[in-house]
Amino acid sequence: MKPLRLLSTDLDGTVVGDNDATRRFRDFWHALPDDLRPVLVFNSGRLIDDQLALLEEVPLPQPDYIIGGVGTMLHAKKRSELETAYTQSLGTGFDPRKIADVMNRIAGVTMQEERYQHGLKSSWFLHDADAAALGEIEAALLAADIDARIVYSSDRDLDILPKAADKGAALAWLCGQLRIGLDESVVSGDTGNDRAMFELKTIRGVIVGNALPELVSLAHQDNRFFHSTAKEADGVIEGLRHWGLNPR
């Protein structure tokens, strides 16, 4: 088993939720020796500005990189050229207005607030959708010549993204730029929109104790995924210890 060089973690319900647990995660992270502390990536459905504001409110360690908007945005404070390169890698032609025209004709769908939208992410609410309902949405988009990716999680949140974007694809791209192998990386999460990170080949994962069944099912399929008994940030600490990361 290779040493860990990178952690990519979801925020809400994973390292954010219980401030005491978040503080314990921060202290655990800061206690790691400088030569063993992995690159820290926050990988959330929140947009970048929202994540930066959150960092002012909760006791998290400072990340090295931020992936936002379910894999549609990258913030790299020390390597800003990566931000432009990643956006360019997603291609052109994604049109939220055209997507909205299609979605507004679908029963049961409502658009999320403006603060959850941006030029490469169209976000909606659709409660308790099954595979057939999601398939109908995908077919309606294709009929309108919209080739996009649908990410559905928490039996409610529906994100429509460029075909090349999701949390996993963004992480794989970043690891490639940093020359860090996926087998040297670990991911942590709690819902279905984190699933794309776990589906990357050779990556290891931590599924926190409060995770939804849509993600917990992965723990029963592959021993690369550790299902913590502890919840939220305490569960991430438990998982990192399982994968051999400990303060000296």
From Swiss-Prot:
Inhibited by the phosphatase inhibitors fluoride, molybdate and orthovanadate. It is an enzyme of class 3 (hydrolase). It catalyses: beta-D-fructofuranosyl alpha-D-mannopyranoside 6(F)-phosphate + H2O = beta-D-fructofuranosyl alpha-D-mannopyranoside + phosphate. Pathway: Carbohydrate metabolism; mannosylfructose biosynthesis; beta-D-fructofuranosyl alpha-D-mannopyranoside from D-fructose 6-phosphate and GDP-alpha-D-mannose: step 2/2. Gene3D superfamilies: 3.90.1070.10, HAD superfamily/HAD-like. Its EC number is 3.1.3.79. Keywords: Hydrolase. Transmembrane segments: none annotated. Pfam families: S6PP. Belongs to the sucrose phosphatase family. This is Mannosylfructose-phosphate phosphatase. It comes from Agrobacterium fabrum (strain C58 / ATCC 33970). The gene is mfppA.
